[in-house]
Amino acid sequence: MAKAAKTIKVEQTRSAIRRQHSQRSTLVGLKLNKIGRVAELQDTPETRGMIAKVQHLVRVIDET
């Protein structure tokens, strides 16, 4: 029986206006594009790296 994949919920708390293009692209990669949006993502090293890159724009709500 396979283990369930761990997930992480991330909410965008600040705007992407006047941010570097790479930070905007990272938000799109995290499935976030508006303040208040919440995305449930798989908890992988790649996702953690993307969150770290835009940590000033998002917050982690829940880690399951």
From Swiss-Prot:
Pfam families: Ribosomal_L30. Keywords: Ribonucleoprotein, Ribosomal protein. It comes from the Bacteria. This is Large ribosomal subunit protein uL30. Transmembrane segments: none annotated. The gene is rpmD. Residues 1-22 are annotated as: Disordered. GO terms for cellular component: cytosolic large ribosomal subunit. Part of the 50S ribosomal subunit. GO terms for biological process: translation. GO terms for molecular function: structural constituent of ribosome. The keyword Chloroplast does not apply. Belongs to the universal ribosomal protein uL30 family.
